[in-house]
A protein has these predicted regions:
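Charge-dense, helix-prone N-terminal extensions
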Residues: 1-129
Length: 129
C-alpha cells in the first residue's frame, strides 16, 4: 500500500491517504487492497466482492467510488454517475475527504455490503446454470 501511495503526486497522495483513513473508520473489517491502480475495499479476498474504491486521478482529484451507489440514499447529492449501479464522488481536497456526508455514504454501503454481494453471487450462479 505504501509503495502505491508514495508513487502519487503530493496533493493527490494527501487526499488518498485521508480517504483511506475515512474508509477504514467507516468499514470495520473491510479488506483493503490495490487493484487496477485503485485502493479497493471488499467483504472478502476476491476483488469481485468489492464494495468501494479510491481511484487517484492525474488531474488532481480522487474518485471515491461505490459499486452499488445507485441505491444509496444521498441527501447531500454527492454521488455522480448514471450507470445501473456505480456512482462516485470527486474529491478535490483533504477537507472534502473529511465531509461527514461522505462518511455516512461509506458506512451505509458497508452496512448493506453482505446483502448486496450475496445478491450478485446469486445472479452469477443463476447465469452459470
Amino acid at each position: 500500500m505504501e509503495e502505491f501511495l508514495s508513487s502519487l503526486p503530493s496533493g493527490v497522495q494527501s487526499i488518498t491517504r485521508e480517504l483511506c483513513a475515512v474508509a477504514r473508520k467507516n468499514m470495520p473489517g473491510a479488506l483493503e487492497f490495490i487493484y487496477h491502480n485503485a485502493v479497493g475495499y471488499s467483504v472478502s479476498e476476491s476483488p469481485f466482492d468489492r464494495i468501494c474504491y479510491i481511484a487517484p486521478q492525474k488531474k488532481g482529484y480522487v474518485n471515491f467510488g461505490f459499486f452499488f451507489g445507485a441505491g444509496l440514499p444521498d441527501p447531500k447529492n454527492l454521488l455522480i454517475g448514471d450507470g445501473k449501479r456505480l456512482r462516485h464522488v470527486k474529491i478535490w481536497s483533504v477537507e472534502e475527504a473529511k465531509n461527514p456526508a461522505l462518511a455516512k455514504l461509506i458506512a451505509q454501503t458497508w452496512k448493506e455490503a453482505p446483502e448486496l454481494i450475496a445478491g450478485i453471487h446469486a445472479v452469477r450462479k443463476k447465469n452459470k446454470a
